Amino acid sequence: MKMTTMTSAYANKVLRKLTEDKEFWLKKEDEGCMYVAAADEEPVIPDYNYTSVAGEIAAIDEKIIKIKHAININNVTNRIQVGTGTMTIDEVLVKMAQLNKRKAVLDRLRKQAPKTRINSGMFSSRKTAPEYQYINYDLELVKGEYERVDAEIAAMQIALDKYNQTFEFEVEI
C-alpha cells in the first residue's frame, strides 16, 4: 500500500472506476463459476479461478473502504466558508439535503392558486353551490422563501464544488 494524495472529486472518480472493476469481476465470476455440458460431448470449461477472482474482488473492496473512510474523515473534520459562517463538509451535505426537501415543499406551495374550484362531481345531488379551496398562507412570502432557500442551496453547492476540486487529503491504497 502507498500513500496517495487526492481531492474529493478525484476520489469519487476513483471510486466509480473501482466499482466498474468490481462489476467486471463479479460478472466474470457469475459467468465462469458454472457450465453446462452434454453427456456425449467434450465440455467447454470457462477460464475461471475462484481464488483469483475472489482475491481481485477483496482487493477492490479494500481500496473502496480506504477511500470512503478518507472521504468521511475529510468530511467531518474540514470546514468551509458558507455564507457568514463555517460548516464541516458533512454538515453542508446534511443541510443541503434538508434544504432541498424544504425547497420541494415551497415549490408546491408557490404554484398553488389563491382560490381553486373543487369539483364535487357532475351528479352530486347534495350540493348545488360550488366549493372552493383557498390557500391559508401569504403566497408572496412563500415565493420569497423559495428564492432564499434556492440561493442558499446554490451558495452551498458552489462552496462545496470549490472545496471538492481543490482541497487535497491523503489516502493509503
Protein language model annotation of sequence segments:
Residues M1-I173:
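Structural preference for solvent-exposed beta-strand-turn elements
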